[in-house]
Structure formats: C-alpha cells, structure tokens
Amino acid sequence: RSDFHDFNIVGGFLTYFDIDKNLQIIHTLYPNITEFSLLTDNSLGGVTMQALVRDKVAGMKGIKMNYIDGRTETYASMLQIIRKMPSDMALLLGTWRVDCNDNFSIGNSSMQVNENNPTLPVFSISGIGMNGLAIGGYYPDFRHDGERLAEICMAYLERFEPQGFVYVSNSSNFDYQLMESFN
C-alpha cells in the first residue's frame, strides 16, 4: 500500500470482531436483554476493541452499552462491578490481561468472575472466557494462527515471497453445558 511505503510489510493477519453478530446471538437467546457491559483491559488490544464497540453501538437504538475499562479499573474493582450486575444484563468479554496498575490477570481469573455473579449471561467477542465462563460468542478462529504465521515467515525468509494478508474467519462457538444451565 502506498501509505506504508517506508515499511517492509510482507504479510499479516486481518481479524474482524463482529459486534452486530454477537448482539444478534444474545438477542436470540435472551430477547429481553438490552443492556450490556463490555470488559476490556489496559492494552492496545483492549483500547482498540472498546473503540470498535463504541463506534458500532453509537447508532443502535434500544442498546445500552456500559464499559468496564481496564485503563481505569483494577482487577478487584472489575470483580465488584460484575458482582453488582443484574441478570437482565449481559457481560461481553473483550480482553482482560492488564488492569490500570499494570497488574496481569492469571488463568483462573475467569472462574473468579463466574463466582462473583453466577447467574449473569456472559458472552465472548474475542474467544476469552470460553473455558467455562462464556456461554458462547462469534469471534475469529485463532486456533491455527501460530502455524500459519510460521509458514508465512519461513516462505519470506527462505524464498523472499511476500504472503500478503490472511483473513481470519469468524465462527460461532458455544459451551453446551453453560447454555443448558442458563435456559
């Protein structure tokens, strides 16, 4: 691309987080839910994801979006906010690794979220929390990115072949046991 002429871009991955599709899924399963909270962390990915969601929901009627923002919240305050959320709201998981104090969360943090509000419908727009916390979501399929990235790098290093951009497809994923327990 002409706007990147001073960079040597030879390939990369393009992902799309489909907010509309996730809200559609939630509305299908929970038709009375119109209020949501998006959880994002204090990282570039978290800030970017929050900006995407803000942009997407700005023109939507009948949707109220709250933000649990890792730039201003600690892990403890995030848990406190989630504890107080009513079950007629849904929590959207975006990213959560780093809080406002640059503290990193650990792998079992999703269980703590669940323990704080076990009746809260939780959905993932990025794939996090699909280990017993999120009911489901529509998000990019990251499962084979490492292998594909290695192939792209090796093709460039060995043969100087630019690979272009690889589009990561999205898919719906659900935790069947959690869906049963919520319906």
Question: What residue spans do the PLM features occupy?
Answer:
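Short hydrophobic alpha-helices and adjacent helix-cap/hinge residues
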Residues: R1-N183
